[in-house]
Amino acid sequence: MASFHSSLLTALCTLCTYGILTMPAYGLDPNHPKHHYHKYSERLKRSNAEDSAFYLSSASESSEDLRQEPRRHILTPVRNVLKDDPCDEGLSISKLLHSIEKETNSQISVDFTILPQWFYPKKSALATSEEKQPTWQFYVSPNISWQLYNSPTAGVGSIDFSYTLIRYWNNSAQNANNAIGIAGEINDYSSRTNTLSLLTFSQTFPGEMLTVSFGQYSLYSIDGTLYDNDQQCGFLSYALSQNASATYSSGSVGAYVQFTPIPSINIQAGFQDAYSIVGSSFDVYNLTKNRYNFYGYFSWAPQSCLGAGQYSALIYSTRNVPQQPVQTTGWSLNFGQYLGEKLYVFGRWNGSTGTAVNLNRSHVLGLASANPINRNPKDLLGAACSMSKVNPKVVTDKKIRKYETVIETFATVGFGPHLSLSPDLQVYIHPARRPDRRSATVYSIRANFFV
């Protein structure tokens, strides 16, 4: 056994010495194809967009150095980070992370959001006292993509990680939902949440057409477009920040195969453990219980004279388990299309069967304009509308409306590379659980800090 370990170590050292597993800095990870939306990949891109010039020059220089002198010691990245002296002008978390990214062949972002929300009406129809205002949501999400190796013979191996941590103070969004009488929610996470959204190892084979991924993931990462699938950078309301009728897991262990025959086509098929609904832990043991969810996904991303676009279809099925005691089938059709350099239009039609969620159909249409006056890359204007069908088998109030509509608009103003503020207005027309009211409103100010 000792001889085997010695031989294996010698072989690995030889591979690294001769550059077979040499890691060029900032190599593109084909696990997330460039033209196809992936929620956590977009977060990494957004975090690094402001420093693109720095990255390009640093990546070019580092790549040249690495080709001439491959890393020969496991502690070389640590030595190089210390040599860069990222804290020479005082403590700078951003500069330290940039240095770590460069030396470890990774991308790192930490997104922190503070979201106060005011709502009207202030109390539900049967309540005697008003709810406390505002609700304060604190949202932290670290994201890491680490490319382990990249070579013509071995392909690309990478590890991806994302975690979602939600806390509330003063009041919760769930109480606000009840007060204004909606079947949806005023944001993507109405209560305290701990979710391991992503922890996968992916192997992309030479040629970059076939990728196999193992680990914990969620379909939320691909089910959407640029601005209707992430509360931290786009719309806030439940029906505009995700698939409102989704019955799939927030994070579950499984595997999927991705086929990208040409850059504009992305096809996926995979399975997950059916028992993990909220994704609070990484539980491999559930795979032995023989209950799995399955999905198929197709995405087409044409590059036309109008601009880049993406059109995708997702279909999935979930099993009956104690945490979600109903079997469901769901679908989601998405499109996003640039009309010129600044204007982006998007839409979604989604639905699901069963009694797992309050809304079983939803239609979305909206538009957004990023950096409209070329002031700051984080500047963004957005307006959208969603009409959702209420599931009467789940929302069992005596009097409910069949449909609920939300119109939302926001304006994000960037301040430097790390901070943005976003005033936001939601107007709910005909709240489903308040037939006595014609509308309800929610006012928000989102403060984002990106590292």
UniProtKB/Swiss-Prot annotation:
Subcellular location: Cell outer membrane
Signal sequence bounds: 1-27
Membrane topology category: Multi-pass membrane protein
Keyword Metal-binding: no
GO molecular function: porin activity
GO terms (BP aspect): amino acid transport; carbohydrate transport; monoatomic ion transport
Gene Ontology annotations for the cellular component aspect, listed alphabetically: cell outer membrane; pore complex
Keyword Nucleotidyltransferase: no
Gene3D superfamilies per the UniProt record, alphabetical: Carbohydrate-selective porin OprB
Keywords: Amino-acid transport, Cell outer membrane, Ion transport, Membrane, Porin, Signal, Transmembrane, Transmembrane beta strand, Transport, Virulence
InterPro entries xrefs: Carb-sel_porin_OprB, OprB_sf
Chief location bin: membrane
Family, similarity comment: Belongs to the OprB family.
Function: Facilitates L-arginine uptake, as part of the AaxABC system. The arginine uptake by the bacterium in the macrophage may be a virulence factor against the host innate immune response.
The name this protein goes by in its record: Porin AaxA
Organism of provenance: Chlamydia caviae (strain ATCC VR-813 / DSM 19441 / 03DC25 / GPIC) (Chlamydophila caviae)
